[in-house]
Regions:
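C-terminal motif of bacterial Sec signal peptides marking the signal peptidase cleavage site
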Residues: 15-18
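Structural motif
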Residues: 71-81, 117, 121-129, 167-177, ...
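Bacterial signal peptide processing site
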Residues: 20-22
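A short beta-strand motif characteristic of beta-propeller blades
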Residues: 41-48, 89-96, 136-143, 184-190, ...
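Repeated scaffold domains used in trafficking and secretory/extracellular systems
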Residues: 50-60, 100-110, 146-156, 190-201, ...
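Residue position within the beta-strands of beta-propeller blades
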Residues: 64-68, 113-116, 159-162, 203-206, ...
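A short helix->beta-strand "capping" segment at the edge of beta-propeller domains
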Residues: 30-52
Length: 360
């Protein structure tokens, strides 16, 4: 009788397991292999059924990210989805309008979600925003083949991007644009300008004038732009948050000096300090900063205009690391099938670091 009961229970289990195509993802909690004996970095591992993932955010227990599904190549991350970590179910938010699409630069400011819909083998790309509560989607840019946009960013309901136009012509130019998600109005805040970053009510961008580089700082509330002098080197803006910006200075590549130094600048008064931070993938958020290499993540604590290294954590085969909101960082691990005879498998692993739970 016991054997019959056990058999019936086993059959019921198999039947229930076969109902539905969604299964809960594999999640584990592990402690990072830290170089410090005092700090404990516990992170959550989540494995999701996609060939590749980009720009993941963590919103209310769901991963909002761009993914390449089993029927696409690993670079064709054409679906923007909301993935429930607990159940493994997901909803499609947006599908790329391109035959070979790649959704990039997903950002969220607490109300508005934005992204860049890019064509893999062309410069065609357009920016979209969505009211996360109502799910209403608006296409912000509608550019032709002679124009291109850079990575968008958002703060306080205003989207910023650098736009290059008259590409291929005799007068190729760039400008910094801003779009108000509430009023749906677009305006130019700077004629000329490169990479733009935004956070906490401000946007920062670099402008080259006569061989000198300045940092433009746009205040969303006042609508005014102030300029901070940087120098005559080559400068790359990395990120902007909490009234500060990170940028990388490359001395003089034209003269063979490609040495680099990372700086942090106070956007209110222009005071700078050397930021002892790896420039690769450097991101600034709240009281922290993070950068990544192919085999490690580096976490930093910000105290005013100073950054100090918390720890470097070995995290093998890091493809990317992004700020996911609320002092959370997500590292995306390279697909386990990369470089093997079997090729890419339909699974991507991510590590979720919650710095709010950092213990000493």
């Amino acid at each position: 009788m016991k054997r019959v009961s056990a058999l019936i229970l086993a059959l019921m289990f198999l039947f229930l397991a076969s109902c539905g195509t969604d299964t809960a993802p594999e999640t584990t909690t592990e402690q990072a292999n830290s170089a410090s004996t005092d700090l404990k970095f516990d992170y959550e591992t989540v494995k999701v059924p996609f060939k590749s993932v980009s720009s993941p955010l963590l919103l209310d227990g769901k991963l909002v990210m761009a993914v390449a599904t089993a029927d696409r190549t690993e670079t064709d991350r054409r679906y923007l989805i909301s993935y429930d970590i607990g159940s493994g179910k997901y909803d499609n938010i947006f599908e790329s309008t391109h035959e070979l699409g790649d959704i990039q630069s997903i950002r969220f400011d607490g109300k508005w979600l934005i992204w860049n819909d890019c064509e893999i083998y062309n410069s065609a790309r357009n920016i979209y925003c969505m009211n996360y509560k109502t799910k209403e989607i608006t296409q912000i840019t509608k550019l032709g083949n002679d124009s291109a946009v850079g990575e968008p960013c958002i703060s306080d309901g205003v989207v910023f991007w650098d736009e290059c136009f008259d590409i291929g012509g005799e007068n190729t130019r760039s400008r910094i644009k801003a779009y108000d998600c509430t009023t749906k109005e677009t305006k130019t805040i700077s004629e000329g300008g490169d990479k733009v970053c935004a956070g906490d009510g401000k946007a920062a961008f670099t402008v080259n004038k006569g061989g000198k580089t300045t940092l433009g700082v746009y205040d969303i509330e006042s609508g005014k732009v102030t300029e901070l002098a940087l120098g005559d080197g080559s400068y790359t803006l990395k990120d902007c948050a909490a009234g500060y910006a990170l940028y990388v200075e490359t001395k003089d590549p034209s003269r063979g000096d490609s040495s680099q130094k990372t700086w942090i600048i106070d956007l209110s008064d222009g005071k700078t300090a050397v930021a002892d931070i790896f420039p690769d993938g450097a991101k600034l958020f709240g009281d922290y900063a993070v950068s990544c290499t192919a085999t490690a993540l580096w976490f930093y604590k910000r105290d005013g205009g100073m950054l100090s290294l918390i720890d470097g954590l070995r995290d093998t085969n890091v493809a990317d690391a992004s700020f996911a909101g609320n002092n959370t960082v997500i590292s995306v691990i390279k697909n386990v099938g990369s470089g093997t005879s079997e090729g890419l498998v339909n699974e991507t692993e991510m590590h979720i670091f919650d710095l709010n739970k950092l213990s000493v």
